[in-house]
Swiss-Prot record:
Designated name of the protein: Elongation factor 1-gamma
Positions carrying N6-malonyllysine: K429
Cross-linked sites for Glycyl lysine isopeptide (Lys-Gly) (interchain with G-Cter in SUMO2): K280
Lineage: Eukaryota, Metazoa, Chordata, Craniata, Vertebrata
Subunit relationships: EF-1 is composed of four subunits: alpha, beta, delta, and gamma.
Pfam name, any one: GST_N
Stretch list, region Disordered: 216-258
Annotated GO MF terms: translation elongation factor activity
Gene3D superfamilies, A to Z: 1.20.1050.10, Glutaredoxin, Translation elongation factor EF1B, gamma chain, conserved domain
Domain GST C-terminal residues, every copy: 83-211
Domain of life the protein comes from: Eukaryota
Primary gene name: EEF1G
Alphabetical list of InterPro entries matching this protein: EF-GSTs, EF1B_G_C, EF1B_G_C_sf, Glutathione-S-Trfase_C-like, Glutathione-S-Trfase_C_sf, Glutathione_S-Trfase, Glutathione_S-Trfase_N, GST_C
GO cellular component: cytoplasm; nucleus
Source species of the chain: Sus scrofa
Length: 432
């Protein structure tokens, strides 16, 4: 796969290959591939007449360009759509990404990266278009985990990659909060192992990036100026460091300017620990998790928990899904729980939970018992943790009460009468 580094269009094929098992070797740097040079050579143009990247060459000599075509080629039947109807819907969303998302996303994001001039009216129009797109997706995803069917397809891969720079660069919390279903789906996808293997850890935008006129000016190629005679007195009088700086500034911006900018943006400082302000606690959650994972729950893990639990440094909470009437198939309800856990991945060091699905198809409920660092709900501490929690009611538990003792025992062991539920245990999920 010929491409330049951090090309979001190439990500589509690489993520698809993670799902299908296709072995793809990436050539994105000299001497194998130099963007702006290699793709203009006669040899490259014989294989790929458009001279565009990404471009794919198979071991058997098969060549194809255009990112959607490459992603389709390296996919399997499940990703492409296993029925004619599903396949048509996949093509629908892939086309939608190109026609409805790429244009406004480019108009809005590119100026903030310093690679396109800013036009206020065009940017405002682009923002409106992005709102429309996110709203359309939000309505579609209200009752769906993924865009087509119950598993990831090329539709999800393509639309996620197309939205990637919007979420990283300009969709700050206040803008994206109006689209909870789209946010939930996006976070579910990027936290799948196959996505993470290609994208790494995606940091969502915290403050909308703005156009920087200076950055834009610096990114433009400089006009040629008359060369001074070698060894001129004026040149010799300047300090060596200053001459180097002038030489560096005079160099034209490389054709890969977008990619260098993307890489710089990706190299962001590590986020602060949202729990750093809390005093140290004697309760070591990781040790309890080891007991819970490796020892008997009732005879070892629970006694350890109550013996070491620090009620001042930690708190217990009972949660219940607000909309049980919307729960239909049990496997879809389980997807709600799993998706929430995936989106809370960074919370694992400071939380533990047992969440249970009760009942059967079209008659079920979800509730759980959570352990959090501190005395308040942890979700408001990070925008990334706020996607799901408002879909649940939360009640703080008294560690000393008999009710809490019963809830912790039943939910942590997955055994008991669950008299407060009124439905039979179906299955449970552990967040640890």
């Amino acid at each position: 796969l010929y491409t330049y580094p951090e090309n979001w269009r190439a990500f589509k094929a690489l993520i698809a290959a993670q799902y299908s098992g296709a072995q793809v070797r990436v050539l994105s740097a000299p001497p194998h591939f130099h963007f702006g040079q290699t793709n203009h050579t006669p040899e490259f143009l014989r294989k790929f007449p458009a001279g565009k990247v990404p471009a794919f060459e198979g071991d058997d000599g098969f060549c194809v360009f255009e990112s959607n075509a490459i992603a389709y080629y390296v996919s399997n039947e499940e990703l492409r759509g296993s029925t004619p109807e599903a396949a048509a819907q996949v093509v629908q969303w892939v086309s939608f990404a190109d026609s409805d998302i790429v244009p406004p996303a480019s108009t809005w994001v590119f100026p903030t990266l310093g690679i396109m001039h800013y036009n206020k009216q065009a940017t405002e129009n682009a923002k409106d278009e992005v709102r429309r797109v996110l709203g359309l997706l939000d309505a579609h995803l209200k009752t769906r985990t993924f865009l087509v069917g119950e598993r990831v397809t090329l539709a999800d891969i393509t639309v996620v990659c197309t939205l990637l720079w919007l979420y990283k660069q300009v969709l700050e919390p206040s803008f994206r909060q109006a689209f909870p279903n789209t946010n939930r789906w996006f976070l579910t996808c990027i936290n799948q192992p196959q996505f993470r293997a290609v994208l790494g850890e995606v940091k969502l935008c915290e403050k909308m990036a703005q156009f920087d006129a200076k950055k834009f000016a610096e990114s433009q190629p400089k006009k040629d100026t008359p060369r001074k005679e070698k060894g001129s007195r004026e040149e010799k009088q300047k300090p060596q460091a200053e001459r180097k700086e002038e030489k560096k500034a005079a160099a034209p911006a490389p054709e890969e300017e977008l990619d260098e900018c993307e890489q710089a943006l990706a190299a962001e400082p590590k986020a602060k620990d949202p729990f750093a302000h809390l005093p140290k606690s004697t309760f070591v959650l990781d040790e309890f998790k080891r007991k819970y994972s490796n020892e008997d729950t009732l005879s070892v893990a629970l006694p350890y928990f109550w013996e070491h639990f620090d009620k001042d440094g930690w708190s217990l909470w009972y949660s219940e899904y607000r909309f049980p009437e919307e729960l239909t198939q049990t496997f879809m309800s389980c997807n709600l729980i799993t998706g929430m856990f995936q989106r809370l991945d960074k919370l694992r060091k400071n939380a533990f939970a047992s969440v249970i699905l009760f009942g059967t198809n079209n008659s079920s409920s979800i509730s759980g018992v959570w352990v959090f660092r501190g005395q308040e709900l942890a979700f408001p501490l990070s925008p990334d943790w706020q996607v799901d929690y408002e879909s649940y009611t939360w009640r703080k538990l008294d560690p000393g009460s008999e009710e809490t003792q019963t809830l912790v025992r039943e939910y942590f062991s997955w055994e008991g009468a669950y008299q407060h539920v009124g439905k039979a245990f179906n299955q449970g999920k552990i967040f640890k």
